[in-house]
Amino acid sequence: LICYNDHGYIGETSESCKNGETTCYEEXWTEARXXIIERACGCXKVKPGVQMKCCKTQ
């Protein structure tokens, strides 16, 4: 599986998921009046205030 791994500050790239990972995630939150979006392989639990979307494809 290949997921985008945009971390907001380095631009959009992609990565091949390791260890048989079958999901990608996108999480977003607001920090110091700026919206932060992070994408990568996996789908984990997040803390309150963070929006998480998980998918099988990009």
From Swiss-Prot:
Q: Does the record bear Disulfide bond in its keywords?
A: yes
Q: What is its main location?
A: secreted
Q: Which locations, inside or outside the cell, does it occupy?
A: Secreted
SUPFAM superfamilies according to UniProt: Snake toxin-like
Secreted among the record's keywords? yes
Physiological role? Binds to muscle nicotinic acetylcholine receptor (nAChR) and inhibit acetylcholine from binding to the receptor, thereby impairing neuromuscular transmission.
The identity of this protein, by name, is Weak neurotoxin D2B
In its UniProt entry, the species of origin is given as Micrurus pyrrhocryptus (Coral snake)
